[in-house]
A protein has these predicted regions:
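Active-site rim elements
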Residues: 190, 244, 388, 541-542, ...
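Generic hydrophobic, helix-prone segments enriched in Leu/Val/Ile
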Residues: 29, 281-295, 493, 515, ...
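Short glycine/threonine-rich turn/loop motifs
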Residues: 39-234, 413-571, 575-579, 586-589, ...
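Periplasmic c-type cytochrome electron-transfer domains
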Residues: 40, 129-372, 384-406, 569, ...
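Short glycine-rich, low-complexity/disordered patches
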Residues: 271-274, 589-593
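Post-cleavage N-terminal segment of exported redox proteins
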Residues: 2-75, 95-98, 120, 293, ...
Length: 685
């Protein structure tokens, strides 16, 4: 345990007191259940007790939520969205909401400024022996054991090849562009698919987070255009006000999933040729049949009513690909008419490229400044003009995808049922739960029913910035974002990074924004969105604990979402447990920003059965519907790149088919359940 307790947030002091009391009163410091069917009163309740966050003024924008969800699911899974006609949102979120591919999934430490691979190289095929990335001599669960290997390489998801965007052609799924020489992601001079600089988190249960992405840059407030919420005070959507087309700022709260959704489709790492903007994405998608190259299962819980005469026989779906409605029709049915019904052409402002920044190698393009609307009587669109529906496509896309992802709630695991008093856990699983709550200290960061402190239901009660006792001294930090020393702070500063807006660049962290607010240097337009620091005047504390901090992920379905951490550097749950038991990888190097609960766990050192108990508990967090892709986790057919064929000219993609499944999931299709990353045993060190 850390030496300092008196300056910790109240909720942590209460948890420490509970830990001490129960350790003293329980035999050997292990909790015991008093009833075979009793829920554990110290554990979080079932996730079914948590309301799904939603914008309070949603009805002002959406007139048919059911159709909006259909639109969102179609867009999320549609491969035509990518600049290459291949990359869908789902391309990186098809396996329990995450990514299980193993070839061309590695990148160098780009966020540390490193462009050199330590392991494998581009198009490498991952193997079990590559993990963990940070290795110690035995015993690996002790901080004193020497380091024998370490790399700042990452495992993430392959995206697009580096390509300069030049235009879209109506009816074509592939954008026009010029393939560029990629200095990093190339094999013998051939540009291959780039790999994202951070591991892919799961989209399942993401609706419960106040902010999304590992660094939280997907703002809780959706501005209709990009991930950065009110930080971009120039972002606008177009509203038809009684025949007058106006640019209006959008500030839609509890919408970090919408903010997140509009980022990747313009990212020159993930889905886009660089220089593409949202109106051009809109023009392209509105000219295409939704899911036009993918089969949709007739029993799909959301899209089934829109399928084109399809039939399912086992894992095969026959008939015609796509849907029987257009994207324009779905938008018109889903959204209030003032956001799409103008006949005026829109001339947008100057094109601006944002990024890369010192902490983010990605870039994206958007139009800046005021736009001009043409006289509707002048007929067809002029050169360079867009329709209102095209110009607002980012708004439709973000909100529709958010509403679809809000249906991806995994709240029926064995742990949920146990906490509801409906089933029993095994003795081993209950011992693991006790370790999770007490000796392991896991609950300190993985709190609440989502098993993360970064969620809406916790942060709205406890506050988004707290004052915390560090190993030495005190600091302000963003609740739910922690430096746990899995990588060096200098390898990726995470929450300590900046947005691409402002000079100097506006920070991501509420702690830093709060300090700027106190100092009087915060831009005036951001003041309403930044809470005061929790420090009564006169307050001289200026220290921030934000560098190297990342959003605490939820743990549900963690069996299926490896590799783990923001760098993807651990392949099994046992490797994760051993990391925490030894007190992290770099506790001394990261001491200035280290979460004070990251310390050696003596109870588990050399205690294999205790570690196995903890892993066994983590496996109770799997929702069987996720594992079997049963409703609401069913989906259309998808083809994902799984590396490039080095034996062919130009190194074409090797494609992996993800078959369409309906409400009955994989069992109804005769498919096996989803597997762990690389098929590894979760108990394997």
């Amino acid at each position: 345990m850390p030496k300092k307790i008196l300056g910790l947030p109240n909720r942590w002091r209460v948890r420490i007191a509970t830990f001490l009391t129960l350790t003293l009163l329980s035999p050997a410091g292990v909790l015991t259940s008093t009833s075979a069917w009793a829920a554990n009163p110290l554990a979080p309740p079932s996730l079914k007790t948590v309301a799904i966050p939603e914008p309070p003024d949603l009805a002002n924008f959406v007139r048919d939520k059911t159709v909006a969800i259909q639109l969102g699911k179609a867009l999320f899974w549609d491969m035509q969205l990518g600049g290459d006609g291949v990359q869908a949102c789902a391309s990186c979120h098809f396996h329990a909401g995450a990514d299980s591919r193993k070839r061309n999934q590695m990148g160098p430490g780009l966020l540390a400024g490193d462009t050199t691979f330590d392991k494998g190289g581009p198009n490498y095929t991952l193997k079990a022996q590559d993990f963990p990335f940070h290795q110690r001599q035995a015993p690996v669960d002790r901080q004193s054991s020497p380091v024998v290997a370490n790399t700042n390489d990452i495992v993430s998801s392959q995206g697009v090849r580096l390509t300069q965007f030049t235009g879209v052609n109506s009816g074509s799924r592939i954008d026009e562009g010029t393939l560029l020489q990629d200095p990093v992601f190339q094999v013998s001079g051939t540009t291959i698919r780039r790999v994202e600089p951070r591991n892919t988190p799961t989209a399942i249960n993401a609706v419960f987070f106040l902010h999304n992405f590992w660094d939280g840059r997907a703002n809780r407030i959706f501005n209709g255009q990009n991930p950065f919420g009110p930080v971009d005070n120039q972002a606008r959507i177009f509203v038809n006000n009684n025949g007058l087309l106006q640019q209006v700022p959008l500030r839609l709260d509890f919408s970090s999933l919408a903010s997140q959704a509009v980022g990747p489709p313009l990212s020159n790492f993930e889905m886009s040729f660089q220089g593409r903007t949202w109106p051009e994405v809109g023009r392209k998608m509105l000219s295409l049949r939704p899911l036009g190259r993918q089969m949709v299962h007739p029993e799909d819980t959301v899209l089934g009513p829109l399928t084109l005469r399809t039939q399912a026989l086992g894992s095969r779906v026959s008939g015609l690909p796509g849907l029987n409605a257009t994207y324009a029709q779905l938008i018109q049915q889903a959204f209030q008419p003032q956001y799409w019904n103008s006949s005026q052409g829109i001339t947008l402002g100057a094109l601006q490229t944002l990024g890369p920044t010192s902490n983010n190698p990605r870039s994206f393009a958007q139009h800046l400044g005021p736009a001009w609307a043409s006289d509707p009587k002048k007929g067809p669109l002029g050169a360079g003009q867009y329709t209102q529906m095209e110009a607002n496509f980012s708004f439709f896309f973000g909100l529709a995808v958010q509403l679809y992802e809000a249906t991806l709630v995994a709240d029926d695991s064995r742990f949920d049922r146990f906490q509801e008093g409906r089933i029993e856990l095994t003795a081993q699983e209950k011992r693991g739960l006790d370790i999770f709550l007490v000796q392991g200290r896991c609950i300190q960061c993985h709190g609440g029913p989502v098993l993360s402190n970064a969620t809406v239901n916790l942060l709205l009660v406890e506050g988004i910035v707290e004052r915390m006792a560090m190993i030495v001294g005190e600091a302000f930090y963003d609740v739910g974002f922690y430096n746990v020393a899995d990588t060096l702070t200098s390898d990726d500063i995470g929450r300590g990074g900046n947005t691409p807006f402002g000079e100097p660049k506006i920070p991501l962290s509420y702690s830093k924004l709060g300090l700027d607010k106190r100092d009087g240097t915060l831009p005036a337009y951001l003041i309403p969105y930044v809470p005061d620091l929790p420090c009564a005047a006169p307050c001289t504390l200026r220290r921030l604990d934000i560098d190297g901090a990342f959003k605490t992920p939820g743990l549900r379905n963690v069996e299926l979402t490896g590799p783990y951490f923001h760098n993807g550097g651990m392949a099994t749950l046992m490797q994760v447990v051993e990391f925490y038991v030894r007190g992290g990888n770099f506790p001394q190097a990261n001491v200035d920003n280290l979460n004070p609960f990251i310390a050696e766990i003596g109870f588990l050192q050399g205690n294999l059965s205790g570690k196995q108990d903890l892993v066994a508990f983590l496996l109770t967090l799997t929702d069987e519907r996720v594992k079997q892709e049963m409703a609401p986790f069913d989906h259309p057919q998808l083809f994902v790149p799984n590396g490039q064929d080095a034996g062919q000219p130009g190194m074409p993609d090797q494609m992996l088919e993800i078959p369409a499944v309906g409400a009955g999931g994989r069992p109804a299709a005769g498919l096996p359940p989803l597997q762990t990353f690389l098929g590894l045993d979760p108990f394997q060190p």
